[in-house]
């Protein structure tokens, strides 16, 4: 097993300070990141750079490595790197040598376990109309690159084309496996989670799987009954207003709410009685005739009663 020249890998000198090495690491990590670089050996180079940074960014491990590198050409050191028959050592032999020179801490540091990458969570805005059918969406997000200390060194822009299934609800989470940050030492990538946010609609309010819409009607439409055109998510329908309807009354339109795999909600039309503008003399006379005809009607009769 070859003792790697971590300084050469990073393109720095052994005398360079941590700030210089950190700058080199950021530049190389961006250059060779598998999601950005088009070079065939990008993944291998990226891991090599990460390995070098993991050692050189730690003061104690860097000192141990420098000592090992300094004695790499010593006869005693060279003899330890070969068997008596001249054959190269294996990984187990290297671990024994590594441990004998720097102690158990170095061996434990060398044998770092595979670590799963971090998950990423982003919010995706979806219009109500888009929930009716499956649709494709291009999303962009930043992929964090972590250093050996678990701190974010940089963020690399990434773009994906994804499918948003029909019937998604507000707050629903969609998992895209392996689209999070890369794992370390052969560990699996993290996942990308899309958190659905249903954008506010100018007409409809969401109540579970149902929708509510406020329908303005005139006093005479409420009193006499009428048929009015009401929009739904798919098309407009003709809604029947029963005679004697009241303000705030809810009229149910079955099957015109949100659609999911389990159920289809309903649409509720909430009536809002809208008065005409200030009446002229003739209109005021008609309102007075109505008031005289309904003089026994007391709208506040049960006001305040349970």
Curated annotation (Swiss-Prot):
Gene Ontology CC annotations of this record: cytoplasm; nucleoid
Pfam families on file: DnaJ, DnaJ_C
Xref: InterPro entries: DNA-bd_curved-DNA (IPR023859), DnaJ_C (IPR002939), DnaJ_domain (IPR001623), DnaJ_domain_CS (IPR018253), HSP40/DnaJ_pept-bd (IPR008971), J_dom_sf (IPR036869)
Protein location: Cytoplasm, Nucleoid
Boundaries of every J domain copy: 5-69
Molecular function as annotated in GO: bent DNA binding; unfolded protein binding
Designated name of the protein: Curved DNA-binding protein
Organism, as annotated: Escherichia coli (strain SMS-3-5 / SECEC)
Transmembrane spans: none
Function, in words: DNA-binding protein that preferentially recognizes a curved DNA sequence. It is probably a functional analog of DnaJ; displays overlapping activities with DnaJ, but functions under different conditions, probably acting as a molecular chaperone in an adaptive response to environmental stresses other than heat shock. Lacks autonomous chaperone activity; binds native substrates and targets them for recognition by DnaK. Its activity is inhibited by the binding of CbpM.
Keyword Hydrolase listed: no
Example GO biological process: chaperone cofactor-dependent protein refolding
Keywords: Chaperone, Cytoplasm, DNA-binding
């Amino acid at each position: 097993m070859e003792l790697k020249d971590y300084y050469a890998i990073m393109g720095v000198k052994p005398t360079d300070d941590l700030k210089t090495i950190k700058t080199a690491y950021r530049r190389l990590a961006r250059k060779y990141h598998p999601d950005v670089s088009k070079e065939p050996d990008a993944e291998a180079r990226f891991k090599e750079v990460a390995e070098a940074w993991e050692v050189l960014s730690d003061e104690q491990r860097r000192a141990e490595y420098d000592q090992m590198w300094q004695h790499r050409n010593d006869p005693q050191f060279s003899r330890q790197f070969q068997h008596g028959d001249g054959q190269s050592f294996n990984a187990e032999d290297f671990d024994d040598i590594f441990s004998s020179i720097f102690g158990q801490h170095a061996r434990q540091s060398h044998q770092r376990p595979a670590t799963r990458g971090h998950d990423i969570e982003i919010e995706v805005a979806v219009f109500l109309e888009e929930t009716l059918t499956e649709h494709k969406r291009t999303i962009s997000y930043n992929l964090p690159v972590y250093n050996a200390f678990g701190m974010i060194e940089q963020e690399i822009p990434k773009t994906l084309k994804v499918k948003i299934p029909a019937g998604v609800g507000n707050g629903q989470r969609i998992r895209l496996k392996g689209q999070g940050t890369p794992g370390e030492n052969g560990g699996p990538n993290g996942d990308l989670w899309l958190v659905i946010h249903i954008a506010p609609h100018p007409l409809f309010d969401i109540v579970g799987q149902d929708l509510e819409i406020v329908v303005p009607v005139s006093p005479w439409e409420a009193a006499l009954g009428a048929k009015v055109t009401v929009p739904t998510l798919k098309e407009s329908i003709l809604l029947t207003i029963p005679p004697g309807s009241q303000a705030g009354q809810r009229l149910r339109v079955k099957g015109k709410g949100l659609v999911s795999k389990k159920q289809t909600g309903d649409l509720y039309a909430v009536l809002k009685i809208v008065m005409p503008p200030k009446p002229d003399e003739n209109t005021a006379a008609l309102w007075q005739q109505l008031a005289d005809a309904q003089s026994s009607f007391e709208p506040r009769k049960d006001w305040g009663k349970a």
